[in-house]
């Protein structure tokens, strides 16, 4: 009987903890996209100079948005 109660207690605490840490999928995707954009900017030697303008650098086909170089593929 003790094992049965312990199993129920663990199940209840697992179910109660499911909603305690919400994950925002948009924030996770933005973080992954920012890391990929930073790696691509370093490969193409791109520099963000002015918001809304093309980034500067050799073979750099990116636009400066949010203080970083964003490529068309994003």
UniProtKB/Swiss-Prot annotation:
Subcellular location field: Secreted
Keywords: Disulfide bond, Ion channel impairing toxin, Neurotoxin, Secreted, Signal, Toxin
Modification after translation (UniProt): Contains 3 disulfide bonds.
Primary location class: secreted
Domain of life: Eukaryota
Propeptide: 26-42
Record-level GO cellular component terms: extracellular region
Residues spanning the signal sequence: 1-25
Gene Ontology terms, MF aspect: ion channel regulator activity; toxin activity
Protein's UniProt keywords contain Lipoprotein: no
Annotated tissue distribution: Expressed by the venom duct.
Family, similarity comment: Belongs to the conopeptide P-like superfamily.
Function: Acts as a neurotoxin by inhibiting an ion channel.
Domain notes: The cysteine framework is IX (C-C-C-C-C-C).
Name listed for the protein in its UniProt record: Turripeptide OL08
Organism: Iotyrris olangoensis
